[in-house]
Amino acid sequence: MEVFTFEKSYLERLKEAEAVLSWEGAVMPASQVRSEWKSYVELKIEPAGWQAIWKIPRVICEDLKLRYPTIVYGYVEQVIFDELKAVFVVTAVQDSDVHLPESNEVSLVELWPTVQQENAALNVDTTAECIDRLRFFYTHVWMPWDKDYDDDRDWVQQHLQARIQLVCDLSKNRLPRPLALHMRTLLAEAKYIQQRLDYLELDLSDAESDDEAVELNDSVAEPARKQSKAGSANGCLNVSSLPVTDLMCLHLRMAIIRSEFEILENPEMRRAYSELQSNSLKRLRCSSGRTRQSEDLLVERNSISHVVTLPGKLQQQLELLKLAQTLVKPESKVQLSNTLQDVLSICQSNDDILLSPGEHTIKFLEHLNDNGSLRGLTQPEAILSPAADLSLLPVVCSSDEDSTLLVIDGDYTLSELVLDCRHVRRGILLRNGTLTMRGCRLLGDGSSSTQEGIVCMPGASVELKSCLIENFAVGVSMRPKSSAELGSVQFKTCKTGLELLEKSASVNLQGSKCSFENCALGILADGFVLGEQRTEKVLVLNKFSELQRYNEDNLLGNCSFYNCKKNVRVFNESGQLLAQRSHQQLLEDELGGENKENIQLV
């Protein structure tokens, strides 16, 4: 089912927003912005009866234990204009395991009207165009803290053009890449925090209503039990205080993001920030002894090897250096460093980095590429041992709750490492090039329904040899026209081990010993050929070879399944909920603000 899409220039976006928010030359306070959009929506959107695709937000997917992104089909029963929401009735889901209430109150910006409508008399093209304007504004222009803006100041005059210009600069790579990636990360986190805040506050209000009703019933029907309830108040307090604590932490983080973004929103301050970063980098490079003259900073050199060691006993350090000696080419220059973060700040993309055992925290806003490598100073068998002590292994983790631990946009190699992804939403985002991983272990949090280990974007390829991927919602996600070669890879305790989102994704398991253990679903294949006799929309297969038989061009080999609830689940290409173009647009949209080089605004 095709959805409406719109390709517009940023000047068109600016004119559209100005047309909605023009107030005859008067001051437009932030508190009035939403009211103007409500009035515009009332004029343009059909009040009921139109079909659409609902892309379920991440916070709801997490709460309902659904994989993300999840999309469902249905129709709008009623538009709630005052809240810019709609009552959406679900009529079809992509996965039969998705269980949702039939009727849901959803935000209009989460809906994508379909081209094909049951009622041809409805003016759905105007409805779709209005939602597109609304979605662009509330996704890229309006910030969560704008509702607290002073009413005596003109919000449109101060922010509208500046923010659309910022979106344009980000999409056209006019900002220094570290700064651009940092700002995108801030924006993505702010949007997610706002969704989480809305969701938690709704839960708290519902809980308070329920508590009031219970107390009222207790006081009327059984007044003698009131003392008993008070006696257990300590236990109740511990339970109810958790959401309050979460709210406090989220509000605090939002305040930090706001203060930083309000500085970077100003073009002059952005330039000053970039110069400050550049000067700090030069000082760091000079202090590392790599260069003596500032002009040498711009000259490319041959790749070198960085050895990162944590404090330890002398004998331990000597043993690590002996191991490093066996891994470094004799003619290669070597730089000793204290932290991985410092190395990532000063190294070239083609440098080799060797890590000592221990925890290495990073907040890396650049990409890894150009045939560089990151390798742990340990034996390969130690990484994959079930009883391994992580404190004795080279572990890479995020310094805070970033959206993605590592972003790869070229050829790169990871070896003998533990990637601790328990505090990020995604372990590795592979944009293009070939990622080679040998003897690596990826750890998820084991509870999230949306966390991904490796995401392989269109045109990219990944080679995994002797790796362990465990405790993710999705171990490896293959997007269209991506490829993977897996050898002796173990998927353990994942909701979905390997995910193939379109029939053009190719996987080679030939000659390997891949295994799926204790996974809810071993392999998910979407839109693949199943033969003429297979007309069911969804099939569950016992072996990968049954799927490979009809897809010999892009699926090779076999694998083993142990204690999986379902081994291979296939969505027949004739039974897809969405057409390929629409499907891809909705799938890639969630990566638009997270470490992306080019934002495609639709």
Swiss-Prot record:
Q: Which GO terms describe its cellular component?
A: centralspindlin complex; female germline ring canal; fusome; intercellular bridge; male germline ring canal; midbody
Q: What happens when the gene is disrupted?
A: Some mutants display multinucleate spermatids, sterility and asymmetric contraction of the contractile ring with subsequent collapse of the cleavage furrow.
The protein's UniProt keywords, in alphabetical order, are: Cell cycle, Cell division, Coiled coil, Meiosis
Q: Name one GO biological process term.
A: male meiosis cytokinesis
Pfam families attached to this UniProt entry: SHCBP_N
Q: Where's it found, cell-wise?
A: Midbody
The tissues in which it is expressed are: Detected in testis (at protein level). Also expressed in ovary.
Coiled coil, from the record:
188-208
Q: Which GO terms describe its molecular function?
A: carbohydrate binding
Q: Which InterPro entries match?
A: Pectin_lyas_fold, Pectin_lyase_fold/virulence, SHCBP1-like
How this chain assembles, per its entry, is: Interacts (via N-terminus) with both members of the centralspindlin complex, Pav and Tum.
Recite the other comments: The name 'nessun dorma' is based on Pavarotti's famous aria from the opera Turandot due to the interaction of nesd with Pav.
| UniProt function note | Required during male meiosis for completion of spermatocyte cytokinesis and possibly also required in female germline cells. Also involved in ring canal formation in male and female germline cells. Not essential for cleavage furrow ingression but is required for contractile ring stability and the attachment of the furrowing membrane to the actomyosin ring in late telophase. Displays high binding affinity for beta-galactosides.
The protein depicted here goes by the name Protein nessun dorma
Gene name for this UniProt entry = nesd
